[in-house]
Regions:
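Cleavable N-terminal export/targeting peptides
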Residues: 1-23
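Short glycine/proline- and aromatic-enriched beta-strand/turn motifs that initiate or cap beta-hairpins
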Residues: 20-65, 70-77, 189, 195-197
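Detector for outer-membrane/organellar transmembrane beta-barrel domains
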Residues: 24, 85, 94-102, 111-123
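Repeated loop/turn-to-beta-strand initiation elements of outer-membrane beta-barrel proteins
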Residues: 24-26, 61-67, 106-110, 155-160
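Transmembrane beta-strands of outer-membrane beta-barrel pores
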Residues: 28-34, 69-75, 101-103, 118-124, ...
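Flexible, solvent-exposed loop segments that connect beta-strands
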Residues: 32-45, 70-92, 122-141, 168-185
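Residues on the lipid-exposed face of transmembrane beta-strands in outer-membrane beta-barrel proteins
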Residues: 51-59, 69, 97-101, 116-118, ...
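Predominantly the C-terminal beta-signal and adjacent terminal strand-loop region
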Residues: 78, 144-198
Length: 198
């Protein structure tokens, strides 16, 4: 876990030192459609929020490489009809590696922009309460993917996005009818992303 944090810090510092070329982009994601499966929770609803900060290094006039940070917050709760009454809160810090292209100009000031990225969890925290017990995660693993296409106007960007995340939290299990299941999040989302580059 410490090694992952060190690698993330060194990577961000490397990009930050290239100040003459690097731009920072902040991105807010607003899902409009989602499909979530949480192992151990069959009839529960998960609520998520996410924030992304990326450093973009130009490879050419219209192509950029990105290194960034994604923060995911998720909560899930058993329905009232459940006798176990499980409630879980999950937080994940992910390293984002991606690329973007904005070479298709619609007008002199508006361009089409395409982005894709892979997200790797570097650390996370989670707590699971229920069945008269409280559990805390001991680690996190998994992978995430992000794709978007949209319009870029100056420093502003609006895009339609698709993303999927598969995250497992070590040390968390749900027990129902004497059967234990390891907790993992499988989240697929479609929505609108708003970005600003500075």
């Amino acid at each position: 876990m410490k090694l992952k944090k060190i690698l993330l810090t060194l990577g961000l510092l490397f990009f930050a030192t290239q100040v003459f070329a690097v731009k920072a982009k902040i991105r807010f994601l607003f899902p409009v459609s989602s499909k979530s499966v949480v192992d151990g929770f069959d009839n529960s609803t998960i609520k998520t929020s996410e924030f992304v900060l990326a450093f973009m290094m130009p490879l050419s006039q219209h192509t950029q490489l990105g290194l960034g940070y994604s923060y995911l917050n998720a909560r899930i709760k058993d329905p009232l009809t459940s006798s176990e009454g499980y409630y879980g809160s999950f937080r994940a810090h992910l390293l984002e590696l991606g690329a973007g292209y904005s070479g298709f100009e619609l007008t002199r000031t508006i361009s089409l922009v395409f982005e894709s990225a892979v997200r790797i969890p570097v650390s996370g925290e989670a707590e699971l309460q229920g069945n008269e017990t409280t559990q805390n995660a001991t680690g996190i693993s998994g992978m995430g993917y992000y794709f978007s296409s949209g319009l870029e106007y100056g420093n502003l960007e609006i895009s339609l996005f698709y993303q999927r995340r598969n995250l497992s939290f070590d040390g968390l299990t749900v027990t129902r009818s004497a059967k234990s299941t390891d907790v993992a999040l499988h989240i697929t989302e479609y929505g609108i992303a708003f970005g600003y580059t500075f």
